[in-house]
Regions:
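N-terminal glycine-/serine-/threonine-rich beta1-alpha1-beta2 phosphate-ribose binding loop
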Residues: 1-84, 195-197
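General beta-strand structural signal in soluble alpha/beta enzymes
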Residues: 92-93, 118-122, 148, 172
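Rossmann-fold NAD(P)-binding glycine/threonine-rich loop
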Residues: 94-118
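A generic structural signal for well-ordered alpha-helical segments
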Residues: 83-84, 107-111, 162
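C-terminal substrate-binding/catalytic lobe of Rossmann-fold NAD(P)-dependent oxidoreductases
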Residues: 5, 24-30, 36-55, 153-258
Length: 258
């Protein structure tokens, strides 16, 4: 049996991470990276793999078994998910929880019409944490499940920040509220709102002359990302961002109490 031939769509942080993971799996090989940028400007780490423009992927339809979609959930995946699923088997980590049913319907329709298989929303959460919840709930059938993310960088929320007009760069940290974690670990099975479980901390580099008040308002009121949380927005320089916020740690807990 030959190796699974992989295509990567999007070459940001996720795409680069997927490339490194493919190298560690002997039954896979990277055939091509697809980008909306000028392919000549994208330097990948895999010898023999090609860099192609997004619009040229159809030409490799018979050379790729699975496309891994590495775009953001805010604006990328809702567009490219169904588009790519019409021609290829796909997998992605779409994580805007409230919009998963809509995204599922759109990708499902395209995949069925193209006679392909698409697996959606199997990243961090939903994904690995979903399996943790399922495993815990199958053991403690009666009880309450709690998920805490962080402290760490949410790549999806960071991507959403960077797409706001006037934002040059930015990063977002998800911070679990310790008092809430302690309540859950006590076994008291508290009823906690979204706002009571996490804080969101945003560090933003604004474009020169940008309206910072408008940027802050756009972040704090963004549906499905920040509007249900207590969110702080701190404006910093590009140099501060590179010096103090260039790493991408993350973590979290799934706790089942019953």
């Amino acid at each position: 049996m030959g190796k699974i031939r992989i295509g990567i769509v999007g070459y940001g942080n996720i795409g680069r991470g997927v490339e490194q993971s493919i190298k560690r799996n002997d039954d896979m090989e990277l055939k091509a990276v697809f980008t909306r940028r000028d392919p000549a400007s994208v330097k990948i780490q895999t010898e023999g793999a090609e860099v192609k423009h997004f619009d040229d992927m159809e030409a490799m339809k018979d050379e790729i078994d699975v496309m891994i979609l590495c775009g953001g959930s805010a604006t990328d995946l809702p567009v490219i998910g169904p588009k790519v699923a019409a021609s290829f088997n796909t997998i992605d980590s779409f994580d805007t929880h409230a919009k998963i049913p809509e995204y599922f319907a759109n990708v499902d329709k395209a995949a069925k019409e193209g006679k392909n298989v698409s697996i959606i929303s199997v990243g961090w959460d939903p994904g690995m944490f979903s399996l943790n919840r399922l495993y815990a709930e199958s053991i403690l059938v009666q009880g309450s499940t709690y998920t805490f993310w962080g402290k760490g960088v949410s790549q999806g929320h960071s991507d959403a920040i960077r797409r706001i007009e006037g934002v040059k760069n930015g990063i977002q940290y998800t911070v679990p509220i310790e008092a809430a974690v302690d309540q859950v670990r006590s076994g008291s099975e508290p009823e906690l709102t979204t706002r009571q479980k996490h804080l969101r901390e945003c560090y933003v580099v604004a474009e020169e002359g940008a309206d910072k008040a408008a940027i802050e308002e756009a972040i704090k009121t963004m549906p499905n990302y920040f509007d249900e949380y207590d969110t702080t927005v701190t404006f910093i320089t590009e140099e501060e961002l590179k010096k103090n916020h260039s790493k991408m740690p993350h973590g979290g807990f799934v706790i089942r109490s019953g």
